[in-house]
Amino acid sequence: MKHPITYLFAALSMFALFSGAALADTYEGRTKCSSCHKSQAKSWKDTAHAKAMESLKPGTRKEAKVKAKLDPEKDYTQDKDCVGCHVDGFGKKGGYTIEAAKKPLAAVGCESCHGPGKNYRGDHRKAGQAFESKGTTTQRKVVADKGQDFKFEEACAACHLNYEGSPWKGAKAPYTPFTPAVDPKYTFDFDKMV
């Protein structure tokens, strides 16, 4: 080895490159979750959450878009003010991006409610296996400390109650145009909906 420092630098660079990519990819997508949660994935497939990104495409949900004063022929799949409520992890590390869209994140999937799965999935799986085999439960704190989110009401409100004049204190721009004033079906009450 004529240049050990060069080799060391190259090795450290490769390590930094690959470990950085792994750390950035914290959202895994619904395919990872559905490998164990088959019945949940099957029932989710037919929901509006599963088709959330589809609703942003031109020509879809025309009547709703017209009521909300949106152009029904516009492609909103590239609109950063809209996409965030239609995908997993938009604007967050490892989440959906318009520039490098990942299909498993292109819907309101598991990680929209439960948080990015990479850091807690292993402990979540072990807890499930322990429950299935021995009937033992795992403290919620174990997976919460690894990033599994249990603030479901907040997660729902971030999109369903994010409009001007909302009773939710966390409402902020960009606001959803789909409000109860546009159509009563957009009235959201967490306790009744979930």
Protein language model regions, located:
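Sequence context of c-type cytochrome heme-c attachment sites
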Residues: 20-106, 111, 117-150, 172-194
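Cleavable N-terminal signal peptides
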Residues: 10-12, 21-22
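Bacterial N-terminal signal peptides that target proteins for export
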Residues: 1-11
